[in-house]
């Protein structure tokens, strides 16, 4: 036995090495089959081989990842068609001469006829009609359309390959391979368009051969062999039907193979193990609701009178179970995907050892960070919604676009910690999701000095910038006083977030955002936009908008801003001076923005202070600044801390002369970003002024402690 396998192996290797000789021998054998009579034993072998080849082809078509994987199919289709016709000729010769075409033909005929000749003929005709009118006709039309569309799409695909190569998206060898595949694809569908004519002709030839066998056999049996008409009709009908079936069944399988190949839709870069069976299963099970609705329909059929209830109930149960299983599987996949995303979030990109990073990851503009313990918590969701409402309100009222928020749940954060990062640099670090209430430390200092803390008063953490706050339980006696202001953790975060967004928002007014505003102006007032672009470049326009946004001046009055820049931009190039001109033009908006029911609450500078500041003005290349002695700077900051305590409700501002406004704002913006600095030129004629006090730099400053942060303040 082993020697037989060795011999067969050698024979197969030799045949593969001489495949062109084997192919030529097969073609010549098919031709000789049409001429030379074959013994019935050999006919049985060839019929079985024909059925095996057709079965192999249809299974192979199921596993093809794409039509191009079987580019030789048109040639195979031609050979199998010729082989089947040659086999039909051989069996016809044996039927007409010897009333015997082998065991397979007779077995097929007797099995299908089953004692009823009419039934056998009907079944045979149905198979033939299905093959000819349904499968062959449809495949032929699909082949025609596919060939036409493939040829029409070739120039576009060629240009796409060339553009990808020029852009560096693919290498030269990849472009060469794609061009070769494109050429093969066009040849394949063009050849399939012609090869389907073979299938159509084969079906027609099968019908003709059946009629020849039946009529010719009946005539030969009655006229030449002297058989009775009934016996001749029975014998030749059985053999004819058997012969037709052994030809039509492989023809039907080949037609199905051709139809499956040319109707296959495959995407570029499809996985190697993809096959049509898997794709059909995945796509049929992608919509579980359809299965559930079908189950309901089958249940409705089961309720109809006279219907087989059990059959429809079983089918309905199977469909319902399949739909519910698919829903469960989708839910499991979603849960797994969320778990994978959470796992990816927990790992820093540089610590990810599961996959290689292949794309550019820019820093995130706005990032909200929570502890991992708050994933899917109501407190985190509520805070995120409040922060987004705050952002949207600022975008609406101030007219500039802010980036959207990225949310991250980090295991590195404490359970009660919240962070707001700008370009991944923490700007706000706060206490989050605690039951205690926050009060200003200055408001309870007297109680702390008297020793009333009783262990329930927790000072705020300095690393969270909460050294001015204390945390108390909600039922603490100090919170029962009516004039005592307190905030919960979320309210305090919102106060700090509003200032942080205002403080960081100006850096997002760049060239792109300024161009968007200019595009809007072009659509509404094209002449104004054209003149503005003629007067100044986009970079200067963006610098003015950025300065306005940094001082919380709304940008919605685009027309006023543009007209002012056109008026003064012809002789002024400094963006700070242009910003002052725009502020004066927007004085009604500014006064309305800061006006309280009793007017503007302002702090003024003493005349001596104004003179001192004016004498210390220095002009740099791009800006004007104060060159103050250290004691004056310390004195100014201490007076500012006293006049403008954080989160004060007076909504006060500083009112100074026009030449001092911009440098004073630049001096105070780091610590007192929320304090507006206005000039007298920015006041309207009808606004009321409520003076709260005056700042005097010549007052003696208080003694500095060793660790006072003002000791090293640089001016």
Swiss-Prot record:
The keyword Cell cycle is assigned to this record: no
Pfam families attached to this UniProt entry: FHIPEP
GO biological process, alphabetically ordered: protein secretion; symbiont-mediated perturbation of host programmed cell death
UniProt superkingdom: Bacteria
UniProt-annotated location(s): Cell inner membrane
Membrane-traversing stretches: 23-43, 45-65, 69-89, 115-135, 203-223, 241-261, 298-318
Stated family: Belongs to the FHIPEP (flagella/HR/invasion proteins export pore) family.
Identification of the protein by name: Harpin secretion protein HrpI
Lineage: Bacteria, Pseudomonadati, Pseudomonadota, Gammaproteobacteria, Enterobacterales
Record's function text: Involved in the secretion of harpin; a proteinaceous elicitor of the hypersensitivity response in plants.
GO cellular component, one term: plasma membrane
Main subcellular location: membrane
InterPro entries assigned to the protein according to its UniProt record, in alphabetical order: FHIPEP_1 (IPR042194), FHIPEP_3 (IPR042193), FHIPEP_4 (IPR042196), FHIPEP_CS (IPR025505), T3SS_FHIPEP (IPR001712), T3SS_HrcV (IPR006302)
PROSITE patterns xref list: FHIPEP
Alphabetically ordered keywords of this record: Cell inner membrane, Cell membrane, Hypersensitive response elicitation, Membrane, Protein transport, Transmembrane, Transmembrane helix, Transport
Membrane topology per record: Multi-pass membrane protein
């Amino acid at each position: 036995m082993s020697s037989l396998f060795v011999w067969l192996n050698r024979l197969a290797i030799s045949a593969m090495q001489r495949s062109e000789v084997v192919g030529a021998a097969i073609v010549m054998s098919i031709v000789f089959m049409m001429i030379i009579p074959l013994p019935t034993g050999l006919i049985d072998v060839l019929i079985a081989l024909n059925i095996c080849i057709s079965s192999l082809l249809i299974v192979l078509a199921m596993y093809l990842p794409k039509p191009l994987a079987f580019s030789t199919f048109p040639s195979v289709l031609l050979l199998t068609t010729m082989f089947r016709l040659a086999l039909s000729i051989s069996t016809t010769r044996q039927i007409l001469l010897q009333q015997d075409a082998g065991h397979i033909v007779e077995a097929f005929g007797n099995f299908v006829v089953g004692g009823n000749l009419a039934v056998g003929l009907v079944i045979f005709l149905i198979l033939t009609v299905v093959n000819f009118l349904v499968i062959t006709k449809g495949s032929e039309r699909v082949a025609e359309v596919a060939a036409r569309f493939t040829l029409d799409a070739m120039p576009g695909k060629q240009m796409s390959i060339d553009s990808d190569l020029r852009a560096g998206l693919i290498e030269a060898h990849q472009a060469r391979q794609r061009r070769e595949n494109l050429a093969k694809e066009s040849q394949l569908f063009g050849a399939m368009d012609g090869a389907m004519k073979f299938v159509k002709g084969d079906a027609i030839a099968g019908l003709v051969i059946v009629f020849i066998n039946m009529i010719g056999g009946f005539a030969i049996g009655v006229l030449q062999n002297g058989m009775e008409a009934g016996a001749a009709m029975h014998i030749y009908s059985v053999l004819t039907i058997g012969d037709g079936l052994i030809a039509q069944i492989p023809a039907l399988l080949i037609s199905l193979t051709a139809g499956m190949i040319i109707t296959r839709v495959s995407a570029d870069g499809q996985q190697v193990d993809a096959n049509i069976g898997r794709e059909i299963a995945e796509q049929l099970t992608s919509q579980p609701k359809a299965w559930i609705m079908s189950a309901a329909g089958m249940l409705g059929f089961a309720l109809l009178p006279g219907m087989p209830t059990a059959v429809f109930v079983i089918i309905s149960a199977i469909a319902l179970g399949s739909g519910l299983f698919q829903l469960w599987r989708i839910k499991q996949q979603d849960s797994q995907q969320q778990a994978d995303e959470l796992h990816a979030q927990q790992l820093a990109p540089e610590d990810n050892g599961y996959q290689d990073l292949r794309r550019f990851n820019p820093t995130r503009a706005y990032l909200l960070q929570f502890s991992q313990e708050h994933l899917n918590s109501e407190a985190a969701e509520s805070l995120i919604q409040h922060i987004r409402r705050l952002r949207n309100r600022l975008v609406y009222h101030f007219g500039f676009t802010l980036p959207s928020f990225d949310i991250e749940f980090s295991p590195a954060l404490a359970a009660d910690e919240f962070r707001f990062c700008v370009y991944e640099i923490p700007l706000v670090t706060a206490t989050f999701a605690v039951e205690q209430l926050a009060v200003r430390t200055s408001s309870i200092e007297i109680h702390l000095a008297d020793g009333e803390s009783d262990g329930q008063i927790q000072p705020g953490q300095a690393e969270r910038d909460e050294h001015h706050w204390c945390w108390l339980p909600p039922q603490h006696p100090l919170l029962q006083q009516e004039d005592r202001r307190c905030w919960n953790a979320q309210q305090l975060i919102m106060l700090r977030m509003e200032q942080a967004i205002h403080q960081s928002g100006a850096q997002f007014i760049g060239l792109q955002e300024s161009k968007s505003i200019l595009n809007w102006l072009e659509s509404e007032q094209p002449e104004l936009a054209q003149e503005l672009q003629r007067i100044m470049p986009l970079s200067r326009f963006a610098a003015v908008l950025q300065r306005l946004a940094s001082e919380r001046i709304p940008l919605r009055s685009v027309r006023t801003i543009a007209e002012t820049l056109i008026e003064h931009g012809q002789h002024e190039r400094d963006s700070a001076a242009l910003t002052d001109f725009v502020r004066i033009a927007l004085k009604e908006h500014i006064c309305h923005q800061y006006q309280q029911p009793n007017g503007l609450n302002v702090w003024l500078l003493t005349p001596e202070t104004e003179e001192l500041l004016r004498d210390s003005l220095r002009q740099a290349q791009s800006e004007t600044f104060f060159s103050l002695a250290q004691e004056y700077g310390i004195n100014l900051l201490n007076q500012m801390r006293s006049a403008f305590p954080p989160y004060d409700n007076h909504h006060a501002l500083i009112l100074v002369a026009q030449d001092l406004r911009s440098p004073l704002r630049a001096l105070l913006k780091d610590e007192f970003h929320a304090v507006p600095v206005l000039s007298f030129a920015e006041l309207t004629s009808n606004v009321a002024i409520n003076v709260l006090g005056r700042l005097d730099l010549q007052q003696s400053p208080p003694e500095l402690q060793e660790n006072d942060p003002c000791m090293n303040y640089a001016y």
